[in-house]
């Protein structure tokens, strides 16, 4: 959650962080925000739609207001990707994604480059390899985005180096171990 204190996030020692999308604008006072310290944790971050705009704005880039002539896109949109970017590694160079935004990335922060674009959106996907920061103006998490789950998987496994070996059995064993440690010889 955007409301999670930075100390709590540090304590969890995350392998990566994903900023989700939403209908807000970074210029509104009541928009979800985190302390900019989040960018100094040394862990990979993936921003989705509003999350991408939040990242860009927080790191010194500029967010513009979309209109019929400037990057307004809603629905299925054809994008072209740089497949040397780890997020798009092994994927098709051209793909349909789901766009839904009123604001757009106008100027990139220092160290970022475009790794995906559409006809109206020059920064449909961006990266800062040195920091491990990636972002998409579109929504890879929805079914309408072709290869979207593969993009998220690439972030988790190729960028964050997560293992993907979680099972319900492992969870149950770990939960039982933690409960026993708390309860001791007591009855549960």
Residue ranges and their predicted role:
Residues 1-19, 23-29, 33-44, 53, ...:
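RNA-binding accessory domains that recognize and position tRNA/RNA substrates
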Residues 49:
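Conserved G/P- and acidic residue-centered "switch" motifs that form tight phosphate/ATP-binding loops
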